[in-house]
């Protein structure tokens, strides 16, 4: 077994705190509209320049194993906050550092770490309640754009494009971020349900200029098996022909004989038809076919539903106002499904998302929700260089998450002011003993930290800024972008409540663990053996 180094009490805590400080000091320079850039070396290619706190945190590994423990602990704060709220990673890191530094002074003075932790937990609970009271909901295009702009480091263009995307696909719609091909940001919205399967044969194309098949007021057949015999299809083809409507066939596959008949019918103009393969594989394919069925009002022809293809009728078919089939994808627009059934299906998938254990499953389920709930928006990020593109995409991603969080739980005044105002909740709180009271004071002091860092990064004196902000009330605060004081909500300087809440919760949780640490165990450095030692110089 590998030998271990063990450190106890102050020796253990001091090394961890050093690591906490190294990581936090590197991350906090990015905080606020006047935050600085961090340049990160890559193993190959150009270095990355970023103002994204979690990107900086993820790159840091320290040589000293004990110090590295501290850095990795705080890295967890940033990562967890990013996972839950999508933003606020730098704020969480700054808060964690402040609580650790204040707490260590009290531990060094001989106070009980467990009582300090109880005091911290009590104070954080009160502050979270106060943040909920300060929070207000957002809904307008302007408010959503403001939140997006703040999270993208005061880039109004990013805020506007995110607000436009949300307006078009709804707050539950999928918004994806891709590399653009021009210098400008672009928004591309796919309305209706899109899946990544195109026509089985190019002979179904009825618009050669666009290389696509367009079916208006179409009937839709859904089948979970291969269609090999044309005899099985005849009843449906005849029914569609009599109804005078085009037909879209979605099946596992359409084999040669059946495909040839469909192509001939289509080319002769007897029946406007197109066939595509069903999306997904295995159980996911069954689920997606069921989604399509609910969206279009169809019944999936399968053994599980007790339906046979050769006995299918018009009642088993779904319909949509328009279907667009291209080489690689199919879009079904304005399906005839029942709105209540679609809503129930969305709720059912959301339950599965909450229970999903893998990120991949969760992502696929979220895609299904978005397709049912309303379209997909693609933000194409434009930039001059690859380095700028990477940095800009990180900011768009942050802003997107923050905007979703704001729509979910509302907004509070930004720039660290909400945390400063929430300190009012601590004025009447007392712990069970003096050590718990000290824990409450630790949080009271730490809540100033984000505003201090924002002011320092903007080149102002933090103590003067805090004093001035405390003279005002409510939304009155310091706008670091302009260097002026005023109503931050009116100025568009806002933070999502969920981001601020998550940052404080995670910071306090991790900081409390550091304060209550009494021993650390790390792998001992390997001693160089005599064989691997460098040869002595012989002097000639």
UniProtKB/Swiss-Prot annotation:
Pfam families in UniProt: Cpn60_TCP1
Record: residues binding ATP: 30-33, 51, 87-91, 415, 479-481, 495
Catalytic activity of the protein: ATP + H2O + a folded polypeptide = ADP + phosphate + an unfolded polypeptide
Disulfide-linked positions: none
Subcellular localization(s) per the UniProt record: Cytoplasm
GO MF annotation terms: ATP binding; ATP-dependent protein folding chaperone; isomerase activity; unfolded protein binding
Enzyme Commission number(s) from the entry: 5.6.1.7
Keyword Isomerase: yes
Signal sequence segment: none
Task of the protein: Together with its co-chaperonin GroES, plays an essential role in assisting protein folding. The GroEL-GroES system forms a nano-cage that allows encapsulation of the non-native substrate proteins and provides a physical environment optimized to promote and accelerate protein folding.
EC supergroup of this enzyme: isomerase
Statement: the UniProt record of this protein carries the keyword Isomerase: yes
Oligomer status and interactors: Forms a cylinder of 14 subunits composed of two heptameric rings stacked back-to-back. Interacts with the co-chaperonin GroES.
Organism: Burkholderia cenocepacia (strain HI2424)
Gene name of the encoded protein: groEL3
CC per GO annotation: cytoplasm
Name by which UniProt lists this protein: Chaperonin GroEL 3
